[in-house]
């Protein structure tokens, strides 16, 4: 019945739409078609400073908030926190590459194409061009990783303060390499906590949840202690023996959807939140010679 639409398909996007309609009739998750032979326009990347800015009545821009970054990851680099810059919240940006911000409608018009390009900012502690100093920054093209990182850090801080440091918190963004790395980064330093909150909300899926479940299922059968220490170790190593709970929501998807089921089935702890996405399908697929990739 979709054949009748083919004469009207003039572009690859039209054909992909028809294929998508066919796939929709399967009522199956993880089934879609990738674009194929489509040339997109070249994107001009906007330079971003990892900060929240507000325009002062003077026309200069006040730095309301600087997003902290993390030195262990390039994608968590926050431009205004680079060593030696001395830029603080409350400072003003009076010019970009020598062009006063008072001469433009929006400061970001001066940052078009500046991502990854060394850019000079004029910084002052007052909303005035007089006395401003110049610093050179390297803008980024995406602030989402910084916002996400700070959201996680705020969650850790909330749990720390609410429990007097007794309970740990681990957020797992997906079930791929990034999610596994994040689990390892935050799980192992908190093995001495009395309990653990694992956050699976908005988990983007992947395939490593069995590895995490295996780690959470570990039970010590022997304890160790150094002669001059009061710290107790476990055999097997890296075992957190306290209670655990798992947070979920409707955006916990794919393997991030299977993870809470496995958590509950293995009686690791309570699952708290709203019903998950409900789309657990293993995917594979074959490439067509014209490049689009139907997945099933």
Q: Where on the chain are the PLM-derived regions?
A:
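Cleft-lining beta-strand/loop regions that shape enzyme active-site pockets
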Residues: 1, 7, 36, 73-80, ...
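Extended, small/polar residue-biased N-terminal targeting/export presequences
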Residues: 3-62, 129-155
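Amphipathic, well-packed alpha-helical segments that form the structural scaffold of globular domains
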Residues: 20-27, 31, 64-71, 184, ...
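PDZ/PDZ-like domain segments forming the peptide/carboxylate-binding groove
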Residues: 43-103, 177
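Conserved small/polar residues in nucleotide/adenosyl-binding loops
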Residues: 289-296
